[in-house]
Structure formats: C-alpha cells, structure tokens
C-alpha cells in the first residue's frame, strides 16, 4: 500500500504528466478512500512520512507524499483513534517512532530543511499525539522527552553529559516551541476554540491541564525562560558575532534564529500564563528580562514581549492579587517612555517620526497592552467584593494610565487608536454609574473626560491625504466602484468614536455641548477668515468634521438627556420654558418658538445656515451641509426666516446643479426630504414657491437613453434595473408636486403651475407613442414613455391623498391629473407588450388613485383591458393586490367597477393558477397569486360586496369561485387557509339565511344550503384532520380559530337543521361513535367560539389518535 500511496500522490500532484484523466481520477479516489479509513491507513502514512533515504539519511519520499501521510496520522489521532483495534498500542508506537524521527531529523538532520509548513504540520501532529499519550498509563514521558531535546546535539546526546552545559539546539528548540504553542491552543488558551467544543472535550482538556500543571508546568516555564534568556543574549551579541561551537559538532544559534526563537519563546509565555501558576511566569528574574526584550529595537521580539505582558496582566486573579501584580509590574512607568519614543507625526520626539510598518505595529501592541491593564483595573473597580482600599489603589493606577490611553487614542494611525476603545468604553461606563449614584466628577475623572472628548472629536477627522469616499455617503457616480476597505474601516471607527462621545454626553451633557459648539464655531470662524484672507487656508477635512459633528449632535443629545421619544422636535432648537404642573413643557407654535432664545443646537444650525460654508469647493462639505439641513429641518419652525438662506444652496452649483453627478443624485433626494419636512412644520414661504420651481425647471426634463447591451440582454430591462440618475430625478418631480400642493389658497395659480410642469411631459408622452406607432422597433420611445409615466406619478405623489370620505368640493388640480391618467391609458394601450411600460402604468395608476381618489376610479376598467392580455403572473399579483386596496378603501364607490371586472379578472387568475410548476420561482409566484386572489375575495366580502358574486354578470362563475375557496382552505399555506375560512364564514353569515326552527325569515341564497352541507360542514373536520395541519404551530391555531368560527356561524344560521345533519348523516358516515357525535353537537350548541375552538382542537387530536 505504501507504493500505491506514493504513486497516487505523484499522479494527483501532477495530472498533466500521467496517461489521462481516468488515471488521475483513480488516484484521487484511492487517496480519498485512505482518508476515510485512517484508523487503518495511519501506519502507512507514518511510514511514508518517516522513511529515510539510506544514501544521505534524508527523507525518502517527496514533500507532497510525506505531507499526505502525515495528514492521515493527524486525522487518526484527532478523529478516528476510537475505531482502532488497539488505541493504546497505536499511540505508544507513534510516541516511540516520533522520538526516533526527531533524533534523526532534528537532532542529527536538517530539521525538515527548515520548511515552515512542514514543521508546523509535524508540530500539530505531535501536539495531538501528546494529548493522546495522557490516555496511556503514567508516567507521561513524551512532554519531558521533548523538552530534553532542546539541548540535544549530534555529537553530544543528553545521556552523555548534562544538558545545562550545552547550548540550545536551534532546530529542536524551534520544533519544541511550535509543539508547546499548539498544545496550549489545543488545551484552551484560545477562547474561541473553547467556545465551540463539546462538554466532554472540555472536561478531557481540563484533566490534561491539571496533569501538566502538577507535573510539567515548572519544567515548561524553566525551559521557555532559558530560551528567552539565551536567545536574547545571542541577539545582543549582534549579527556578526562568531559561533563558539562551530567545530565541535554542537549546534548554536546564529543571529537570525536567535531572533526567531526569542520571539517564539516569548509568545509561549503569553500562551501558558493564562493557565499555569503565575509564580512560574512572574519572578524577580523573568520580569526584568521581559522588560529588556520589550525595549529592544528588533520589532519581532518587542511585539512578542508586549503580548506576553498583556497575557500576564489579563490572567484571571482575585482583585487584591491582580492589583499587587499590576503594582509590581508598574507598567505605566515602563510604557510611557516607549510610547513617547515611538510617536509618529507632529508629536514625534525631536521631529523624528518613524512611520515604518514595524513601529506602527509596535505601537498597536503597546496600545493593546495598555488597554488590557485598563480593563483589569476597571474590573477591580466594578468588583463589589473587593476591599475599598483595593478599589482606591486600582483607580490610582488607572489614573496613571489615562495619559497613555489618550496618547494611543490620538495616534496618527487608526489601528493603535482602536485598541483603546474597549477600555475607554469601560471607563466611561464606570463614570456613568458613579453619576447615577449622585457622585460628582472631579479631579482626574473630570480632566480625563475633558481631554477625551477633544481627542475623540479630532480623531473623527479624515486624514489630510485622504480621498473622500463618495459612495459611502450616497454620492457615487453611476460607474463608480465600491469604496475600498480602508474607507469602510475609517467610517466604522467614526461610529465607534461617536459611541464614545455619546457616552461622554450621557455623563456630562454640558461638556459635550460646549466642546462641540467650540469646535463648530471655531471652524466656521476660521472658514470666514480664510474666505476673506487670500493667504488663509482651511482644509475640507476640517469643515467636514465640523459638519459631521453637528449632524450627530442632535441624536447624541436626545439620548443623553433621556428624551429619545421627543426626538428632534422644534423645541430642541430653543431654550424652552419650564415644564408645567404635569411635568411636560408646553407645545409651542412657530410664532412662540420664534420669540424664544436659541439653544446650543439652534445656535450651531443658525450659524451653519448663515455661514456660507456650503460654498467651500469640495463635495464632502456641500453634501454634509445638506445632510445637516435635512436632519435639522425642524429648526426652521423656530426660525422660518432662515429658510431663505438655506434653499438657494440646494438649487445652484452646490446642490442639484453640482458638477458631480453622484452629488446631484444625493442632493435630489435631500431636497425632497427638506421640502417635505418643511411642509410638515409649515415653514415653506409661500411667496418663494414659484422661484423654487423655476430653479428646478431645467431639471424637470426627461431624456431616456438606451444603454449599451450584449446580444443576450434586453435594453429596456437593463435601462430600468440600476438606480441611476433618473431614479433620483424622480425626487425632483415629487418635490415639485409638494411645492405646488402648498398653493391651496391660490387654486388658479396652483393649476397654472401644475400644468406648466405636467403638460410638456404629457405632450412628450403623446409624441413618443406616435413615434413608436410609426416605428415599432423604436425602443427609445418605449423607454421615454416609461420614464414619463414615473415622472408624472411622482409629481402626483407630492400632493396629499384625498380622503375617500371627504365631502369637500373636488380641488381644481384633480382635473389635471385626470388628464394625465387618460394619457397613461392611451400609452399603455399602444405599448402593453412591454413589461417596463406595464409596470410603470400600474405604478402611475396606483399613485393617481391615492392622490385623486374617486375621480380616477372610472379609469380602472380601461387599465385592466389594456393590461390583462399581456400581464404576467407576477404582474397580476401586483395588480390584484392594488385592486384589493381600492376595494378596502372605497367600498361601495367601486362596487359597479368590481362587478364589471370580476369575471375577466378571475378567469385570468385561474389561467395562471392552473399552470404547471417547473421550478422554485414558479412555485413562489403561484403561492403569491393564491394569496392575492384570496385577499381580493376577502376584501370584497369585508366591504359588503357579496352581491357582486351573484350579479347577473358573475353568478355563472359563483360555483367555481366557491370551490376555489374550499380548495385553498386545505391546499395552501396557513395564511391563505386562514383567509379562505374567513371568507367562508362571512359568506355563510350573509347567504345561509336561517332555518324555521330559529324563527327567522331570512332568505337563503338558492343552492347555498346544499353547498354548506356538501362542502363546508365536511371541511370543518377534514381540514384540521390533515397530517399537514400542525396543532403546535401558532399560524395553524389561527386557522383553527377561523374553522371553529365557521362551525359556530353555520349553527347560528341553520340551527337544529345542522345538528340533525351531523347526528344522522355526516358523523355516522365517517364512523364517528354515537356518544362522541352527541358530545360534539352538545359542545357546538352550548360553548362560545373561544371555548369551542379548544374543544375542536381536542376532538380532532383524539380522532387522529393523539
């Protein structure tokens, strides 16, 4: 099998060199088979891995073959050892063979040619083997044997002389350190791995950790610290120091592997300190050594030392013990000079800024170490069981760390800053709890907060050399790629910093408010100075930061002052009067608000509007300016005069006429939001409306352009798929509609302005239809009609919806939209073969109905006539849902329309429902159409339109409709079943009349009594008796409620006649025992609906054998 394995690996590794694909396939199948039987194939795998070449005593086989063999051993030890016939013997054999291999390859050989991936895999297998040796009887010898090999050499074995007299063998030491690292990770120093392991695995690991702690931890710690010490000494000798053992057959470290081994051994300290005795790690000898390593300029070893110290300070300990450890280490005194010496940028020592990757990385590790100690001190402060003196000393130590926290948070590079976030948030949490207890922030805490908010706000600023990520602010060009990862990271950091600033505001809202106001107002002052001084300069980054801070100020303050439900109301912008006797400030009108002094936020927004900062020539500034106006649109309820300062910027080169298309797209939306919100607070100056519309006039032009397409692409679909400029242009039409709608007090002017916008568009639509009729291949005209329909419907969307119950005279502007609706009908009649036009027409019509109400209802039949012959199943769903909404809203007003349409509509619905299902998409569409159909029938019944079903036009289809409802009551999802049963019990209530026994003279719909007994009564029992009906499901319980309501409704309408039918016909027919049948009818007649539902549940469960 060994030769077969070698051949298979070589074939699989080089498929082009063999005879053909069949041979490769056979080789791969053979190798896969070996991987499934590693409890048998592991021995072959080990043989291939460890086989030696007799000529040079090196590995016999290729690296690929050896690695595959080792993978078989790894899988056996990790996953399949329990399948072995003798697991203990297999482990013992592997242990002995592994030691022999190390002697041959690492003590006497080349150490697997120092190939890192081979050494890593072998170390991983050794770690798993070491774990399995703990299932053998003690003593456990593999770990001590491995540690003894650290000083094993070709010419002097450990048995020949004291190993302490020998130097470290770099090859064996490297391997042993890799094994120790994998062993610690496997045993649980990696918290992530522990979180996903089984309880049994965790228990096994705990037993092995206890064994190592009791018998091997001291040896591990001593060996590792000696490696650190000897490796570091060799590093200090320099790169060109001579090797004293070069001729003795004893291997010694050179400079390169001394650096590697020192770093690796230091890393082991971090691995093991979390689960071995701290006294083995922290001693009078080891701490100075670790500090020396930390101060060494070589990046690899000093970052390892920083991580080791982080592991030490993060070790789980009692508060008093942790404090003693932290005080003994005195890390603030150690880290402070290192932080100062490694600074970059303007704050670098002596102007010497080291921006190398290694220095930046080291600062990140120092920040991580500082943050770790901060978290530990915070935990002591949070520990209620800790002595007061312990907490006081912990706060003193924490205070000594705060300058370091601020230094790293303000680092020029974000990675170091981000390391401090968790510690800063925990500090702020402690401060916040103290404030809740009534404690004042004084001394170090107050000073830290004051410094922290300044640092956090400045850290939010874009770098001087940064490019503005337009896409992240909704201003990407149509052909822009996504913003890169660095931009995303910065924006994520901004959000984290905003969380920190928000926490500060919750502790001291005055500090927050003052700090933000100072930043904002000083920036605006600098901008004004630079605008008037030709030599003055201010960067877009500075202004954008001020605007960004204004933008989030309101949200932070509403949360900090515990008033999120109030939100950014107009009262937020003024100094409101005191609350009344009920504890609430009075609600003020715009005139009252105008007479109150502005709040801090109001002052900033007013300064923003009046500063002309939007004229700064950078899109980031302009767009953030508009974002702020929209965020704080309620400000203009308090200072309506400022609207005239804000609106011009929207209309000129700074806004909707910006040179960058991406900015225009975003501003189109923001202008819509701004005008809509101003309407809500009655802050739009009426005499300014016409000027605004004139400013938008040149943009209210629709120009459809077909995109370039491949041979298999539909140009119309491609043109309407992406959210390009036209989609944002629709907001301008809606904005125009809002503006025109405000002129209700001048209806003639209102109609004139509305026609000025709409009539050119309607005329373009008419011309496009004519162009298409002359040339049916003219797809540009089709797309133009699509765009114009959407533009006109967006225009109508700006008007408030007319109430269906309104008794006011019809506004004059309704007539304009009726004309538009007529033009839409003409256009869809000519272009109904194009799905994009059908979709636009449906959308436009739905919008017109909402806006104009009853006035456009008579046009619905014309729309259906134009659509039905071409409509798809998905489109039909949309239209049926629309019709359901119309029925619910207008009820009797659309009775005649529904009567006229129902027959052809139901026929079209059945056409699609009767189609076969060929895939998942078809199944989903069919399900959606079922729901839409049921909802339409339900809307008709709930709106009192039962008579439509039995009108002269539709009565011939009644039986088919009823049968379809019965069908879907048991052959659809729960939501559809619920609707179906709801329809049925409402129809029973309307059409079932009453039996003479009940003393009523209500007439029964001819034939409906038969339908009840032939279909509905059996349905009460058959539907919940189905295997697919899950009584434990909440939706099914709702269906059962409707079923029980149907039963009770039939009884209420037919009385004893129903009881007689159940006892004499139906229940005997399904072999129901007489006593149980009598019990059912008794409960049906005596229980209310809620109680009967519970009984029906139990009855069906019992009948199903449950």
From Swiss-Prot:
Keyword Nucleotide-binding among UniProt keywords: no
Keyword tRNA processing included in the entry's annotation: yes
Subcellular location: Nucleus; Cytoplasm
GO cellular component terms listed in the entry, alphabetical order: cytoplasm; nuclear matrix; nuclear pore
Region (Disordered): 336-357
Domain of life: Eukaryota
A matching Pfam family: Xpo1
GO molecular function: small GTPase binding; tRNA binding
An annotated GO BP: tRNA re-export from nucleus
Family note: Belongs to the exportin family.
Protein name: Exportin-T
Source organism (scientific name): Mycosarcoma maydis (Corn smut fungus)
